[in-house]
């Protein structure tokens, strides 16, 4: 008995069914890491980008009022913990960062108890 072989039409149909079952990402783009900072409203309402993929390097497509612009993410998710001023902070009292992107991993650049900023674990 001859073996049953699917024809080219059956192969194309199978491929189409497989592709229909895959989850779709809008525009096929992946969101870049980081979080957009709060930006001043752009009065021109310029639409520089629609997604992160349209921005160079590690810039993100961020909302600025009615505009969207490519901007360097400098804020990470979470919020800074409240500083307890009742107790003096031990350790070096100097600035360790200026923006979140200066801190490794998930750490955020936040004010510490001695009036400077350092990389700390955020609150989620």
From Swiss-Prot:
Query: Annotated Gene Ontology MF terms?
Result: aspartic-type endopeptidase inhibitor activity; cysteine-type endopeptidase inhibitor activity; serine-type endopeptidase inhibitor activity
Give the species this sequence originates from: Canis lupus familiaris
WAP domain: from which residue to which, for each copy?
A: 29-73, 74-123
- Give the InterPro entries listed for this entry: Elafin-like_sf (IPR036645), WAP_dom (IPR008197), WAP_four-disulfide_core (IPR050514)
Q: Self-association or partners: how does it assemble?
A: Homotrimer; disulfide-linked.
**Tissues with expression:** Epididymis. Highest levels are found in the caput and proximal cauda regions. Lower levels in the distal cauda. Not detected in the efferent ducts.
Q: List the disulfide bonds.
A: 36-62, 45-66, 49-61, 55-70, 80-110, 93-114, 97-109, 103-119
GO annotation terms (biological process): antibacterial humoral response; innate immune response
What are the protein's UniProt keywords?
Aspartic protease inhibitor, Disulfide bond, Glycoprotein, Protease inhibitor, Repeat, Secreted, Serine protease inhibitor, Signal, Thiol protease inhibitor
Q: Which Gene3D superfamilies does the record associate with it? A: Elafin-like
PANTHER family assigned to the protein according to its UniProt record, in alphabetical order:
WAP FOUR-DISULFIDE CORE DOMAIN PROTEIN 2 (PTHR19441:SF34), WHEY ACDIC PROTEIN WAP (PTHR19441)
Kindly list the places in or outside the cell where this protein is found, as annotated in its UniProt entry: Secreted
Position of the signal peptide: 1-27
Q: Which PROSITE patterns match?
A: WAP
**One Pfam family matching this protein:** WAP
UniProt KW Disulfide bond keyword:
yes
What's the name of its gene? Answer: WFDC2
| Glycosites | 44
Specify the protein name.
WAP four-disulfide core domain protein 2
Q: Does the keyword Membrane apply?
A: no
